[in-house]
Structure formats: C-alpha cells, structure tokens
C-alpha cells in the first residue's frame, strides 16, 4: 500500500523532490586557493576572490571538477564532456560578489539514478536529474551581537555539488532512505563527508500533493533542512498544510518556506523565484569546461567498491543475510571493520557479535568504530577465545564490557580475573553432585517426567561454577548423571 495522507475529501498522494547541496572535499575552494577547513576562526579563510574584490578573477579548481565527475560516475550518471558556468544574480548580505557562479543550462553531470530500500524490503529507483557545481555563500550570524548581524565569509566560494532528484519520492520514508543512500555513496567516494550537523550536506525539499492520477499541483520548497529526521518531519508538516488549503477551497502559492523543528511547522520565507528572476547569463570570466574522455575514464578506474556491490559481495562471500550486509555497508568503516574481523573466522559469529553486543556497547559508551577501544584485532581475539572454548558466550559478554570500560585486551582480562572456562570433567561432576544433592525434590519431579527441569539443573550447575563451566560438557555430564526424564 502506497503512502497517503487522509484528508476530509479522501486520500492525498505526496510528490517529493530533493535538491541536495553537498560540500566538495577539497583543500581549497572552487575558484580560489583559500582553505576550506571546518571550524576555523571567522573570516580567516577568505581570498580576495571570495570577498568579491574588484578585478579578482576566478580560477577553476581541477580537484573540485574531478570530485564532481567521480560523484556523477558513482550515481551511474551521464558525464557531460562540455559544461558551462553561469552567473546567478541575486542580493544577499553573505554573497559579497552580488552573484553566485553556478551552472544552469549546461551542468557537468546529467541524468542518473539511485536505488533505495525501504523498511519493508521494497526497493525503488529514484531518478537524478543533474549535478552541477557552484559556489557556496558566506554565513550570516545573528546570535553574536545584540543589535547587529555578522558575516563570516569562510564558507564563501567553497565548492558545492547541487544534486537534483526527479520528483519520484512519494513518502517521508522514501526521502529519508534517498538521503541516507546518497550520503553513503558520497562518503564511499570521498567526495563529501555528509556531515549535516556541520552544514556540509543540506537539503532543499520540494513538496506538493495531489489526488491519485492527477497532474502535479503547485509545489513549495523548504530551504536548508539540516538533518534527515527534520527532512521527514518537514515533508509531513508541509503536505498536511497544503492539504488543508486545497480542501478549504484555496490555492497553494509557489513559495520558499522554512521548517521550524520545535513547532513542527513550516513558515513562509519568500515567494519562490523562477529561473528568469535570477537573470542567468554565461560567466564571462570562465571559459566553457571541456573534459577529455580519457581523463573521465581514468577517474572511473579509481572508484571504490560502492555500497550495493559491497553488499552483494558480503552476502555471497560471507553468507550474510541481506539485512546484515545492509547494516554493515551503511558506513564504509563498519564494512571494513567486519571484513577485518571475519577474515579467517566464522563470519556469522562475527556478524552476530557486531550487530548485538558490540554495537550496543558503542551506543552505551558514545563512541564510534573509529574511536572504539575495542579494535577489529581485539574483537577478533575475543571471538577466538570463544571458538577455542577458552571462555563461553556468557563470560565473553562480560569480557567485552570490560574491554570497553578498561581498554584492556580480552586475553589479559580473562587471565587477570580467572575467567577461563572449566573443562575439567572432575570439577564438573563435583558441581553436578552438589546441585543434585541440594535439589532432591526437583530431581524426583524430573524423574517423573518433567523434562523442562533439565534446563533448571544446567542453570544451577553453571551458577555453582560461576558461569565458567563448558556448556557442552555440563550438558553431557548432566545427562549421564541424572538420565532421561521419566526414566
């Protein structure tokens, strides 16, 4: 069943398109040599070009072009060997030139596609209309002074890739899945870090509603939404607002809006401009951008294994389920961690421990895989202790917690705390004898046919051995000692 919102006049379908602004990973800006490091002192990374000084000419950054091409290739998109930069004219305080250098009619990357997977397991293909390069603007800061707004131009001139989707999404979930998949691809490619909290990936959300089978109605754009969760909330809030207007007999105005997360509503920012309002014309200070086919092919040869291909390989080579492989490939570092641990080991055992206790401790301690005190080598050591029966699974859980809390290796913790599994059959028999003697009534019930009491005896023996008994040996010895139920 497709996603709809029920109004007073029936079901409404959502039509969603996303324009994602992804900051290019590059040491310098798109048209100047100024640095791009996040968090630098305000206005400490600004060249005369970025500040819009008269007579300063832009010089294209080859690496930014290469990053855009890599991204296009990663999106299975058409690379345009000839593209052109244009001036997009508008006034804003943090745009010192009075125009933005962008690409309008002739973008560097054409049509492509992304396949997304929903929680239900259903897959959908979302079309990519285009990717173009453009300059970012500076940043207006309204909370630094009681009566003035301040401008930080560090971001001015930083290279952005604007990745425009087709209006193919029909629910907040699909939009969220699209953004997560796009961010994962960009991170694998190394072309954008995807850190929405730092502003290096931002989304403009286009939303309209219609009855099933109708043509598209008027859309509104929600600007600069900076988290996937907020994108999903903004879509639902804006769709409900538009439905109320249509059902009341009104019309939706094409406009740009902002999302207020605290109130869960969108509010009007300005009337939505059309392309002619920006008076686009070819950038006179830059020649058309002409790429050689051989150069594009050389970039294609450097592409890493992308998420979909990696997932298929993990399923094939390691016997993982689609769900397990999908979790691991969401972040390249997670997939690499898994492969390192799984090399030469039982892959299903590794997957179970990573998806269970290991991820749980990452969440508990607020650490990432990169900063975790439990490295791939150390997790592998712990799993080896389970495999060779030095410790059992219950003890291993305790050891893993101690590894996170102390930073010590598994072997050192097991030795220091005397946690080695007991495999001495004499010690196991002695523990069983004590438990049986203390629970004569339970033994009588077991002998009378209450077979579930076998688990009780196993638990009591393990408790008597402080969890160190080898479970298989305990089960074997217990069956030998107390026999079958009802016997």
UniProtKB/Swiss-Prot annotation:
Pfam families: GatB_N, GatB_Yqey
Enzyme class (EC, first level): ligase
Alphabetized SMART domains for the sequence: GatB_Yqey
Entry keyword Protein biosynthesis: yes
Annotated protein name in UniProt: Aspartyl/glutamyl-tRNA(Asn/Gln) amidotransferase subunit B
HAMAP family xrefs: GatB
Membrane is among the record's keywords: no
Source taxonomy: Bacteria, Pseudomonadati, Pseudomonadota, Alphaproteobacteria, Acetobacterales
GO process terms (BP): glutaminyl-tRNAGln biosynthesis via transamidation; translation
EC number: 6.3.5.-
Biological role: Allows the formation of correctly charged Asn-tRNA(Asn) or Gln-tRNA(Gln) through the transamidation of misacylated Asp-tRNA(Asn) or Glu-tRNA(Gln) in organisms which lack either or both of asparaginyl-tRNA or glutaminyl-tRNA synthetases. The reaction takes place in the presence of glutamine and ATP through an activated phospho-Asp-tRNA(Asn) or phospho-Glu-tRNA(Gln).
Description of how the protein assembles with itself and partners: Heterotrimer of A, B and C subunits.
Stored Gene3D superfamilies: 1.10.10.410, GatB domain, N-terminal subdomain
UniProt cross-references to InterPro entries, sorted A to Z: Asn/Gln-tRNA_amidoTrfase_suB/E, Asn/Gln-tRNA_Trfase_suB/E_cat, Asn/Gln_amidotransferase, Asn/Gln_tRNA_amidoTrase-B-like, GatB, GatB_C_1, GatB_Yqey_C_2, Gln-tRNA_amidoTrfase_suB_CS
Similarity comment text for this entry: Belongs to the GatB/GatE family. GatB subfamily.
Catalyses which reaction(s): L-glutamyl-tRNA(Gln) + L-glutamine + ATP + H2O = L-glutaminyl-tRNA(Gln) + L-glutamate + ADP + phosphate + H(+); L-aspartyl-tRNA(Asn) + L-glutamine + ATP + H2O = L-asparaginyl-tRNA(Asn) + L-glutamate + ADP + phosphate + 2 H(+)
Domain of life: Bacteria
Stretch forming the signal peptide: none
Keywords associated with the record: ATP-binding, Ligase, Nucleotide-binding, Protein biosynthesis
NCBIfam families named in the record: gatB, PRK05477.1-2, PRK05477.1-4, PRK05477.1-5
GO molecular function: asparaginyl-tRNA synthase (glutamine-hydrolyzing) activity; ATP binding; glutaminyl-tRNA synthase (glutamine-hydrolyzing) activity
PANTHER family registered for this protein in UniProt: GLUTAMYL-TRNA GLN AMIDOTRANSFERASE SUBUNIT B MITOCHONDRIAL AND PROKARYOTIC PET112-RELATED, GLUTAMYL-TRNA(GLN) AMIDOTRANSFERASE SUBUNIT B, MITOCHONDRIAL
